[in-house]
Amino acid sequence: MKYSTSKLKFNLLISASVFSILTGCGGGGGGYSGGSGGSPTYATTTTTISSTPTTTNPNTNITNTTPLLMPASVPQPVVTGTDIVGVNLQNTTSSPLAAHVFTFGQIFKQGDVLPNDTLVARINGTAYPVQLDILATWPADGSVKLGAITLTTPAMIAGSTVGVLLAKATGSDPTFGTTPAVDLVSASASNNLTLNVSFSGVSPSPVDLAAALHTALTGSPTYWLHGPLATQARVDVPHSGSLHITADVTAYADGSLTADVQFNNDFTTVLPSTGAANPAAALPALQYTATINLQGTSTNHTVSQIQYTDWHVVRNTTGAPMLNVSSSTEPAINVQHDLAYLEHSGAVLPYDRTTGVANDSTLYGSAFYSIAYVMGTTGFGTPFASNGLERYMGQTGARPDIGYTTMWNTVWLMTQDSRAATVALAQGDSGGAVPWNFKLANGHWLTPGDWPNIFVGYNNGPQGGTDGIANYSYTNYPSNDPTAWYTDTGHQPNLAYIPYIMTGQRWYLDRLYAQAAFCEISMTPFKSSPYQASGRYAGQLTSDPSLANAADIVITPGNQLRGSAWDMREIQEAAFV
């Protein structure tokens, strides 16, 4: 039996004719074209090893002794048409890890995996059944583009690496057969699930997420994961004002549970154009302590949360799988993907896989010096931390957080090192801390798809011929506040795309969608562009009557080329997955 689920798609409007603009600002182009028909050919430098991978200890990437870190050597396909792609699972801790269920993200080349294919994981010569949840498909043939891979890991000794080869099941391989999907309702009931969030400083309190989840599951739930190893569903509970609490709850076959709880202060109201200044000024930050109680175990988080920001925390019951999520420490299990395969799929840009990355955390200016510095900074991995990013995005020059993707994402891709992964995942979380998360009451991220004349930028508000949003000030960056953010699409970092395709975690897709939506609404609407009425561009684009009031034109002469390029990078990545 095949287990899969499809996610809800983002309400994006894309003008395909402007994709080539990405090459105009040093950003590169064509990194996401993908597909079997037009994929370029690159030299493969990844070491080919047996299709029956072995367990090694220690792994040099984990012990951090290798002077030069090269792309990870992962199991390579041996049987054409059956073997697909390999990964490594690394125990980054100093203690043994028992066998447990684990989920990660995997990009597939077009045509490699069809929706009805059954996958297995070949580990040390033995095949194990795999749960595949389909997160994105290739439009040309419907094959799987991005999947959430859930499997049961073997027991792993401290510092060890286990090679895993994903393959299509053959007649002799074990499968789940008719095993039913984990029943989240029954699992919640049998565990007497309690998942409460209480507040000190804001009301009402508490929020019973377990009861809300039960109500949602008795209707027509949408599952993110749904199979014999794990089932995940989402519940969202409005709290007060623009604050709402979202929880992605996962039940596993052994009865354990995980909850990814989001505190989203992002609901917005659109103000139709009136020609007047914004009458709804920015609201003061919410000051509160949130207590999250899962099965009787509580944690407290005291935060100051401004509007249009989101943060999250992951809680596990005893025995629940350790997730590959950001925190102040390295993930317990690090997944090493096949960089060459990712490149050939079109999911990432092609890198020179022969140079390596110097593994020196003491050399000032080196990548791993930066990684060590960021991880050692007070507050790293906590809600609203910058995690090494430049809060004033208008700052120019020699910044490791701007480029087609960030330096930390690049090092993660090129080395698959757990330290780089830790920083990159934490920076993916930082996308929630930037005040660019604008959600409508209908659940959509705010885009021209709902409000064609919307503009969030300088002079925000219902003046100047555009619609604006309430409680937002583009110029509210206080120079004396080290925790404030100043957004600038011309220098915005690429935060959530790489974390999402590597982990398959829904939180990172939320962050990707939010940033991409902001990119759409931060560009002057086409029909309201001042360059349409006068100046050297007058009539240039409106000469085609079909474009006169087009809501889906997001690149206009009123925007800088680099800003449009980085905007389209985010929009294209969101559309890709």
What is each residue range found by the language model?
Residues Y128, P204, T299-V303:
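Short, isolated positions in well-ordered beta-strands
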Residues I62-V202, L213, T222-Y223, L229, ...:
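Alpha-mannosidase-like glycoside hydrolase catalytic domains involved in N-glycan trimming
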Residues K2-I14:
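Bacterial N-terminal signal peptides that target proteins for export
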Residues G37-T47, K168-V182, P435, A516-K527:
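Compositionally biased, low-complexity linear motifs
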Residues H214-V577:
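Catalytic cores of extracellular degradative/oxidative enzymes
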Residues V18, T92-T93, L151-M156, P238-G241, ...:
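Short, flexible beta-strand-to-coil junctions
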Residues S15-N57, I62-T63:
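Bacterial Sec-dependent N-terminal signal peptides
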